Amino acid sequence: HFAELSSSEINATELVAMLIGMGNSIKEGIDYVQNNVKGSCSMLVLTDHAIYAARDKFGRTPISIGKNDKGYVCASESSSYANLGYSFVRDLGPGEIVQMSADGVREVTPPGCRKQVCSFLWVYYGYPSAWYEGINVEDARYESGAAMARHDADLEIDYAAGIPDSG
């Protein structure tokens, strides 16, 4: 369980950690958080022997798994894997929990069927080379622009410009 807080104030991460600690196991604690916290909460939980990766129960925020010959990795953006020498394996499904250890990846909780992915992943948050749910961010942005151009083809427009990347 979790030993201490960073200060006299509680932040969201520490609150989730304390809620996980209320379970009799990491899985029970994650289930408790996923079923009682309003909103989306995907997480990675580090233990002495494993990393648990849990995607929020509606699949709004992504987590994917990568692999190389030395082991596994997980992240919210699979585009980071190539720079680290890993290849993409798969996305976690809504509510899915996996345990990654030296022995491999083990499914702890299977994915649910209800998915409500955040569309801002493709429109705003995602790095252009990232892929979410099998759809490339840059391609989605170009296709969205093309669809808007077709929709507004009969309007007299002087100029159209994309929204610059943020951050």
Residue ranges and their predicted role:
Residues 167:
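Carboxylate/His-rich catalytic cores and anion/metal-binding grooves
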Residues 1-94, 99-164:
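Conserved short alpha-helical segments that host acidic/polar catalytic motifs at enzyme active sites
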